């Protein structure tokens, strides 16, 4: 069993910028869970189930708001089966994931981001649930996987004009939920060992079918995005190690987002001394200075285009020395870790 209790009180005084806010959230979660696993020759089976009761009480200026105080009673299952024999393996799984919004999003207060950008939460956000089906297969150094997700009440940021009559040109970033979203993906990985060269090739395809018509955004595009990366490791004579990695992400249009082609190349040369306690590393990041991030965002009567260079280009020398450090003997995470992350 698991119990989590949260009591959060936020007071925002805006000094005339916008209306003040006084939000108080009390939440309690009670859960019980069980799982069963069994091995049958080359097969492994696992089943789990979790029952969760969640009660939220939301107060604005001391008054309980019923519409913002939901109660959930959820059954969350997990099913998995895998087979492995003679270097070959195959797996199938299904799981339901439940995600609650961060508490910082459950507020009506307007926050200042910049002269032309404000942000606002949404106390009416519902719990996001993801039904995920996945399959994977491997043989020696080859691996393939595929997944399909059906996401209910997916959280997303949207943009819209903020009080055009008194704040012309200002965009408001708000959080909304899209009732139903489908997410598909496949991945291929190859990691052979060819003498001193150990390459690792990854090819991924992601497809997001996100229709935002119900929240007022008419743009709806369906185009997959491909991601290709190649990581090369070279174990050279006399203890030298060289690594060169690069990636390429193709342009795509998904839902109301448009992304551009991105790519980057990095390199690293290192050698250890004094029984591997002293390491000297030469680094070169974003060698071709291509670390740009491009995206366009369509909103409600609004459009935003971004082209950002993330200043990744670096050339340097690193020297590190390892001392005898005592490792932590405790590796637990605690039952309330996800709730603390929301805070």
Where are the regions a protein language model picked out?
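Transmembrane beta-strands of outer-membrane beta-barrel pores
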Residues: 1, 38-42, 51-57, 83-87, ...
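C-terminal beta-signal and adjacent terminal beta-strands/loops
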Residues: 273-343
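C-terminal beta-barrel architecture of Gram-negative outer-membrane proteins
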Residues: 205-210, 225-273, 283-288, 296-297, ...
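Surface-exposed extracellular loop regions of Gram-negative outer-membrane beta-barrel proteins
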Residues: 27-65, 72-78, 198-207, 228-251
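Transmembrane beta-strands of outer-membrane beta-barrel proteins
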Residues: 1, 45-49, 77, 90-92, ...
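Residues on the lipid-exposed face of transmembrane beta-strands in outer-membrane beta-barrel proteins
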Residues: 32-38, 79-83, 92, 125, ...
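Outer membrane beta-barrel strand-and-loop segments of large Gram-negative receptors
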Residues: 20, 26-29, 120, 126, ...
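Outer-membrane beta-barrel signature, preferentially recognizing the C-terminal barrel domain
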Residues: 24-25, 67-70, 98-152, 171-184, ...
């Amino acid at each position: 069993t698991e119990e989590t209790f949260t009591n959060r009180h936020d007071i925002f005084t805006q000094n005339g910028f916008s209306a003040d806010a006084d939000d108080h959230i009390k939440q309690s979660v009670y859960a019980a869970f069980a799982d069963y696993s069994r091995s049958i020759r080359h097969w492994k089976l696992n089943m789990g189930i979790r029952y969760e009761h969640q009660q939220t009480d939301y107060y604005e200026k001391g008054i309980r708001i019923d519409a913002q105080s939901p109660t959930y009673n959820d059954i969350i299952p997990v099913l998995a089966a895998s087979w492995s024999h003679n270097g070959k393996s195959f797996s199938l799984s299904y799981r339901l994931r439940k995600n609650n919004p961060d508490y910082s999003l459950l507020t009506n207060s307007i926050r200042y981001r910049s002269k032309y950008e404000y942000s606002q939460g949404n106390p009416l956000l519902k719990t996001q649930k993801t039904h995920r089906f996945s399959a994977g297969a491997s043989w020696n150094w080859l691996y393939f996987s595929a997944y399909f997700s059906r996401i209910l009440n997916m959280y997303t940021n949207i943009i819209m004009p903020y009080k055009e009559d008194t704040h012309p040109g200002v965009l408001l970033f708000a959080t909304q939920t899209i009732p139903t979203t489908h997410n598909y993906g496949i991945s291929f990985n190859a990691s052979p060992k060819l003498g001193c060269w150990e390459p690792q090739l990854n090819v991924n395809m992601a497809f997001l079918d996100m229709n935002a018509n119900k929240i007022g955004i008419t743009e709806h595009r369906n185009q997959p995005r491909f991601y290709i990366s190649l990581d090369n490791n070279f174990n050279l004579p006399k203890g030298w190690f060289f690594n060169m990695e690069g990636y390429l992400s193709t342009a795509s249009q998904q839902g109301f987002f448009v992304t551009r082609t991105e790519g980057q190349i990095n390199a690293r040369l290192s050698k250890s001394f004094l029984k591997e306690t002293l390491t000297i590393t030469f680094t070169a990041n974003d060698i071709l200075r291509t670390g740009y991030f491009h995206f366009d965002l369509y909103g409600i009567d609004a459009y935003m285009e971004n082209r950002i260079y993330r200043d990744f280009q670096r050339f340097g020398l690193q020297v590190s020395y390892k001392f005898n450090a005592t490792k932590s003997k405790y590796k637990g995470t605690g039952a309330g870790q996800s709730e603390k992350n929301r805070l």
